[in-house]
Structure formats: structure tokens, C-alpha cells
Amino acid sequence: MNWHFPFFILTTVTLYSVHSQFNSLSLEELGSNTGIQVFNQIIKSRPHENVVVSPHGIASILGMLQLGADGKTKKQLSTVMRYNVNGVGKVLKKINKAIVSKKNKDIVTVANAVFLRNGFKMEVPFAVRNKDVFQCEVQNVNFQDPASASESINFWVKNETRGMIDNLLSPNLIDGALTRLVLVNAVYFKGLWKSRFQPESTKKRTFVAGDGKSYQVPMLAQLSVFRSGSTRTPNGLWYNFIELPYHGESISMLIALPTESSTPLSAIIPHITTKTIDSWMNTMVPKRMQLVLPKFTAVAQTDLKEPLKALGITEMFEPSKANFTKITRSESLHVSHILQKAKIEVSEDGTKASAATTAILIARSSPPWFIVDRPFLFSIRHNPTGAILFLGQVNKP
């Protein structure tokens, strides 16, 4: 006998275009840690590819799922995330508000939505809690027409990402008979550098990619004061890191790469956690230096199903075991896909250099160099909360 189970799809889309007021290991840092663990699982199978994810987006989707889960399904989510969303809803709401605050000066938007099959009966407490904690909107769509349903969802995504990401969800991922709902998270960030890279300084330079081949790529260059530092992994591999603040200074890009060119990026990434990144922020010192960084655009779409299963979140994907009775009691649901599409653009754009920076640019003494000419790790961090909005590796710009 063939059993047919209703299911739902989760999608999270993220976009980037160019100390903490919470406790020492905040809820948002715990959520970001989950995203970092997922990232580590992804790069195991894609060590030489460009990969970009949004830990905050992953935490948001899993948080919405946790609100609708019960039994062992909820326990697995809570164990991996290390907190119960219901118990800390007020704090999560405060964190989400801080991330999108206009005080950031840079543009940050986080949007969540649930797309329901026409006539689907969703439990009222789940809908109310989801709206309160994650500001999640609800829309009805006709999943029996997969092309129309995917078009509606993709239109929402395109609108929330300012037209930069479309075609997230293909019609063939929607089962007209069984799909009941699609959860979507979209994160958009556009930041201007605090200290702008001048276009005339951008020149082609050599970048040694993850495959060992050399490529000539456009490199941004700037002489300014940056906070930077170095440390080593538990097994003694040294690496360097540097902070590039955006003009609002509440958000920064952090870049890390091995000190020795013979050390692969994959050797240091497994040791990176939110606690590690916090330690960078606390130990970096300002230095006048020449920074050389690739100008790049990277886009990646990833199904997070297998990485999450590797971390121990398995039941929600199994039709006979998944428990989402807090979403609906009328039928059994399971998750068929968790998709994330992320895009990052790094260029010269930014605010004009300050007078102090201009003065530094013409100073005569010879500064140290920080040259990013081989595979590197980057993160976009919301400093007041410790939230990691974006995380990625670049093997070839």
C-alpha cells in the first residue's frame, strides 16, 4: 500500500549588498551557532566552492518550526538550537527589533511569511505566536496550481529583497495534492563602508583559488586604520582576521584567512563559533594598514535538509514520525525541503572617507599589509546582539 502524507516546504532567502547589550552568550548567538554548524556541514561536500548562508535566517526558520512542533520533533529542534522559543519569545522579539532598527543606519530588513493552501486550518495559537515573535505574515495560495503558487511566493521574495533574488522556489518542488504550507524567511542588507574603497585603486591582482590555480581578479585596495588580529586553532594553526565596519558601525564584515598560504581554509573553519568571533571582537586592535580585498559577487542556493539531519534534526523530515500538531491537528505534516538562497556583493561602495582617514591615506610611513589573495571566510555581524546575518567562504571571486 502506498501512503501519501501532506507536507510543507521551508525556504529562507538572504541577500547582502555592499559590546553586546544582551548576556554573554545571547539567544541570537545561540541561533547563529546553529547556522554556523549547518555551514560546516555544507562545506564538507563543497570544500572548493563559494558558499554563503544566513545563520540568522536559518535560526528564524527553525524557530518558527519549533513553535509548531511537539514531542520528539520539538525536542530535537530545541536540543540543536539550545533554547525553547516559547520560553524566550519576548527576548527574541527584542533581538529581531534591534536587528532591523533604523539606528543601524545601514538597511536591514527581515521578513517572514507562511503561505497556506486555500482552506488549510492552522491552529490559532501557532499563528498568533508566530506573528508576535517573528512578525510573520500569512497568505493563502493555490498549491493545486504549482506554477501559480511558486509565482506568488517568488514575487514576495523578490519584493522583500528589492528585486535582487527571484525564482527561489521552482514549481516542481510543490506537490499540488500534498503541499499544505510554505514557510519563508527573507533577510536583506545593504551596507555602505565606513571607509570607502576608491574605484581608482581597484586593480587586477593574482588570487590563488581553492583549486590551486591562479586567477587575475579585480582587487579593492585601501590604506586606512582597521581593527585586526591573529590567533590559532586548538591544533596550532595560525590565522588572521580583520574588521571592516559599515558606516552605521553597528554592523561589520569580518574576514579571516590562514596566516600561512600552505594552510587550507578548511583547516580553520571547523573551529569557528560565535564565541570565537566574540573573542576576535574583544582582542582586535586598531592598526594603520594597507588592505587588499577581492571585489566579488557570490550566490548560492542550498537545501539544508541533509546538513540538519547530520546535526540530529531528523524526525521532522519523516512522514511517519514528524509531529507538527501545534500547526494543525486535522492532518499529519512533515517537512519536505528547507531551501536557502543567499547572495552577496562586495564592491567599492561606501560613505566618503573622513578627514582623518584622508590624512592617514597620505601619511608617509610604510604600513603593514593585509592581503586577501587566497580562499577566505567572511561574516556579516550585527554587533549589538552578536547575530551573524551572513557567513560564507570564497574560494574563487
Swiss-Prot record:
Presence of the UniProt keyword Ribonucleoprotein in the record: no
Residue positions with a glycan: N159
Subcellular location: Secreted, Extracellular space
Site keyed Reactive bond: positions: R364, S365
Claim: Signal is one of the keywords in the record: yes
Record keywords, A-Z: Developmental protein, Differentiation, Glycoprotein, Heparin-binding, Neurogenesis, Protease inhibitor, Secreted, Serine protease inhibitor, Signal
Similarity comment: family membership: Belongs to the serpin family.
Protein name: Glia-derived nexin
Organism: Mus musculus (Mouse)
Taxonomic lineage of the native organism: Eukaryota, Metazoa, Chordata, Craniata, Vertebrata
